[in-house]
């Protein structure tokens, strides 16, 4: 039973780790599509523009100008090659040794979202792993002793085990008493054999 409980604890830890990894993937690689407001509901909140990952700027309505949807820090953190598309040297990254805009991307920016097909495939894979781990946990729980017994049956079984334990303890004590008696008899026999072989050494010494 102790081994089953150890396996169960390990599976629970692994399940928690899988949940954390799954949520981390969904948050990191989702496309962050804006919510779709309900139709024919004038009181519904307007749809929000796509929010950049790790953004600290407040969300803006989807119809707001592009400049109001990003903070100055976010605008300055854009890829330099994208800022020069209006000029003649588009694709050149300042301060990057004449490299392209893709090569000079800011490493602090979050990774690009996965394609819908890749994202859906990995979602299914992560969900399958969670289901398999949950089934392992259910199996370990099902093989625990007494899992299908009621509380009254478990109490009755505990009392029976207590009686068996007391009986085994009484039998052990009886065996210990018998062993002590046998040891005492054996010591007497060995003493008699020693006297028969060597005689009374004290009496022999006094005669001399």
Swiss-Prot record:
Q: Where is this region: Disordered?
A: 52-122
Please give the Pfam families that the UniProt record associates with this protein.
Answer: Med21 (PF11221)
**Is the DNA-binding keyword given for this protein?**
no
**Location of this chain's protein in the cell:** Nucleus
**Biased segments, Low complexity type:** 63-83
A Gene Ontology term for the protein's cellular component: mediator complex
Q: One GO biological process from the UniProt record?
A: regulation of transcription by RNA polymerase II
Tell me which UniProt keywords the record has, alphabetically.
Activator, Coiled coil, Nucleus, Transcription, Transcription regulation
* Compositionally biased tracts (Gly residues): 84-104
**What does it do?**
Component of the Mediator complex, a coactivator involved in the regulated transcription of nearly all RNA polymerase II-dependent genes. Mediator functions as a bridge to convey information from gene-specific regulatory proteins to the basal RNA polymerase II transcription machinery. Mediator is recruited to promoters by direct interactions with regulatory proteins and serves as a scaffold for the assembly of a functional preinitiation complex with RNA polymerase II and the general transcription factors.
Q: How does it assemble?
A: Component of the Mediator complex.
Could you tell me which PANTHER family the record lists for this protein? MEDIATOR OF RNA POLYMERASE II TRANSCRIPTION SUBUNIT 21, RNA POLYMERASE II HOLOENZYME COMPONENT SRB7
Q: Which protein is depicted?
A: Mediator of RNA polymerase II transcription subunit 21
